UniProtKB/Swiss-Prot annotation:
A molecular function (GO) term: manganese ion binding
PANTHER family (UniProt xref): MANNONATE DEHYDRATASE
Organism taxonomic ancestry: Bacteria, Bacillati, Bacillota, Bacilli, Lactobacillales
Gene name tied to this protein: uxuA
Superkingdom to which the source organism belongs: Bacteria
Keyword terms, alphabetized: Iron, Lyase, Manganese
Organism: Levilactobacillus brevis (strain ATCC 367 / BCRC 12310 / CIP 105137 / JCM 1170 / LMG 11437 / NCIMB 947 / NCTC 947) (Lactobacillus brevis)
Protein name, UniProt field: Mannonate dehydratase
Assigned EC number: 4.2.1.8
């Protein structure tokens, strides 16, 4: 296992590579090219420039998060083939730079949804939160909430150019149900997996966040049954998963350690997001929490134990952190709480290693 840290680049992140290098145990930077429009080819020279920048700081770059999927592919429009060809070339360019894992998602319109970016916790810290009653509002209300409370940062999946077309996107998805969305994912996988095999790259699909239908939009990676359906679409191990403990754990019916034990031995999990959440109601409302098991509703020790016992050898990163110690950065992506999360996860892993 290698510990990683998500970084938004020197132009988009208040955190510096030198800061990341000083977090004990971090070996990988999980990065991306954030200025390339969705659907366009990522230029090889820009990928290599990012790789060299990361390596100059004494870190590695083998995981990309994310190469986003154009909505025409998810909707299944005739224009999807052009965007799929671009995606295939991006895979080749990333592979040429040494990238081996590509995290992506297949969520319509919104990559993730929270109803509060600054939910106040009892200790004075702030965290991301989701309340189901809040999504009864119009999507535009949620968009305003995100835009007005992001501390001046652009959040992944909430880029202004996409949000400006949100009504057109809802109209375009009007005829897409869960069955059709799954068929469109199948079409996409059939086109890109041969390229992945040729280039020795593994795709790592991220779970729906939260794993429930929102605004009438379908979801197709919510639980173990969905994962089995996705495996059946294309049996190649290049068709892999990101296990996001928080996203899957947002459904209390999901047994995250059991999911890990099912798919890590299959060689389908190159990438893990480790995050804890705390349920606030029986309706599935939650806020994010510190990584420590006792601070949330997930057993982080059992999760790390499942990874250890199944021989997980991919990259793991702390997911969203709280805003603590007067930090005011990109919500969920500050330095301090994610660094604390890494220290905790590393401690669990060392204990598991020495007990083995």
């Amino acid at each position: 296992m290698e510990m990683g840290f998500r970084w938004y680049g020197s132009q988009n992140d208040q955190i510096h590579l030198a800061d990341i290098r000083q977090i004990p145990g971090v070996r990988q930077v999980v990065g991306a090219l954030f200025d390339i429009p969705v659907g366009e080819v990522w230029p090889e020279d820009q990928i290599i420039r990012l790789k060299h920048q990361i390596e100059a700081a004494g870190l590695k770059f083998t995981v990309v998060e994310s190469v986003n999927i154009h909505d025409d592919i998810k909707i299944g429009l005739p224009s999807r083939d052009r965007y799929i060809e671009n995606y295939q070339q991006t895979i080749r360019n990333l592979a040429a730079a040494g990238v081996r894992t590509i995290c992506y998602n297949f969520m319509p319109i919104f990559d993730w949804v929270r109803t509060n970016l600054h939910f106040s916790l009892a200790d004075g810290s702030q965290a991301l939160a989701f309340e189901h009653r809040q999504v009864q509002r119009q999507p535009q209300d949620i968009i305003h909430e995100i835009e007005n409370n992001a501390n001046g940062f652009v959040l992944p999946g909430w880029e202004p150019e996409r949000l400006a077309q949100v009504q057109q996107l809802f109209d375009a998805y009007a005829g897409v149900d869960e069955t059709q969305l799954a068929a469109n994912l199948n079409y996409f996988l059939d086109a890109i997996i041969p390229v992945c095999e040729e280039c020795h790259v593994q795709m790592a699909l991220h779970p729906d966040d939260p794993p429930r239908e929102l605004f009438g939009l379908p979801r197709i990676y919510k639980n173990l049954a969905d994962m089995n359906r996705i495996v059946a679409m294309n049996p190649s191990t290049a068709n892999g998963f990101t296990i996001c403990t928080g996203s899957l754990g947002e459904n209390p019916q999901n047994d995250v350690p059991a999911i890990i034990r099912e798919f890590v031995p299959q060689g389908r999990v190159p990438f893990v997001h480790a995050r804890n959440i705390k349920f606030m109601s029986d309706q599935g409302d939650f806020h994010e929490s510190a990584h420590l098991s006792s601070m949330g509703s997930l057993d982080m020790f059992a999760i790390m134990q499942a990874l250890h016992e199944t021989g997980f050898s991919g990259v793991i990163r702390p997911d969203h952190g709280r805003d603590i110690w007067h930090e005011s950065g990109r919500p969920g992506y500050g330095l301090y709480d994610r660094a604390l999360g890494i220290t905790y996860l590393n401690g669990l892993w060392e204990a598991l290693e020495k007990q083995a």
